[in-house]
Amino acid sequence: MNKVDVRAKLAELGLELPVAALPVAAYVPAIRTGNLVFTAGQLPLVNGTMAGFGKFDGEITPERAKELAQICALNCLAAVETVADVNKITKIVRVVGYVNGVPGYINAPVVVNGASELFLAIWGDGAKHARSAFGIA
């Protein structure tokens, strides 16, 4: 994958890299080991405020759910920035998403596309990754 100016690419997409949220418990936003960075789970926080509440396919539409997943992905990039330069990212290895849905909700993978599609928009085909998407109630 070619080097990408992440902030410039985000600006082209009408987005910007947020400031990483402060941890609310005994963990760090991200940790680096060698050339790998692992991020903590992220919520759809914008300037410290939840961007959405509710269950998908209940109070939150599928379209809005994808937007919230994109916000979580942006927050992951902000977490990376606490331990490494996001412009040095050369590969997205794995994405895991937990989607709060109504009982019987089966479209968690569609929601998590909001994150995957952001990474693909930034890094192109080089951002193809393994992924798990879980629906939780």
Regions found by a protein language model. Name each.
Residues 1-137:
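Short, polar/acidic, helix-capping and beta-turn segments at strand->helix junctions
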